[in-house]
Amino acid sequence: MFKKLFLPVGILIAVIWSLAAPAAGLFCKEYIGTPAMIVAIFLVSGMQVKFNELKFDRKFVLALIFGSGFTLVGLSFCGWLTLNWMNWDKALLAGLLVMLAAPPTLSSGIVMTNQSNGNMMLSIAITVFYNLIAIVTLPLVLGFLLNAAAAGNVDSWKMFKQLILTVMLPLFIGYGIKKYIMKSFYHKLIDYIPLTATIMLSLAFFAAARESILAIPIVTVLVVLFAALIFHIFSMAALWFISKVLRMSVADTKAMVFCGASKSATMALAMVAIAGLGSSAAAVPCLLFYALQLFLDAVLANYARRF
């Protein structure tokens, strides 16, 4: 229970702390740096990934193709088409688009699948491969959408190179370290490093964007939460429909829905930094979306255990 609550409670404390006293967050941003925190997150995430447990079959390949196509590309364009005509603050629009384009979380999606009695192995496969595919889709999708929405001047090639250096390489290096060096003495406390780094990222982003965030009306926050709710439910419904078309089992469907529809706040915050939006309010929709997702998925996962 402590580990499950560590990230959401930690992010909540970080947000309140950074808005009340931004000095700690500004210190993290200035002297530790967001790239170092991102590398730490994915270095340890690589140690947690279990590539050897993945199983390939026809349904997995089809789920990978159609599921990733929707959640990594289609959902983002749906969000852009829906929100672009509204008079949104550009930073908030950018943050929501980043979250919609993000791959699944590296942990909570699997936890929710397991909680719902879904196919945990398929959820692991979806998590690993969606995150790898996202290395390619994120710079392409966000490079187009953020520029088209005038929400940021994004260089797709630069973004791709930074994703390789700060996400993909640390992920595989971490996997190699766990497999060949720390195989017998990996301590579970190491699992808290990416969680702590994500909290520090939140602290840094909210401290840097404090003035912009405090200027956001409460009504706008509620609108962002409502938009996040609509898009998350839409994503889960679409993935449920895809799984039915592919005639997947109930357990596989649960993995598709709970894992495929989950969005990684860690990756979203990393993308906010890489896209040069770290000093704006772009992190706000990411964290609001993440908090709403955690609550809604926990409720639905417990309900889904009946089926």
Each model region followed by its residue ranges:
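Alpha-helical transmembrane segments of multi-pass small-molecule/ion transporters
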Residues: M1-F307
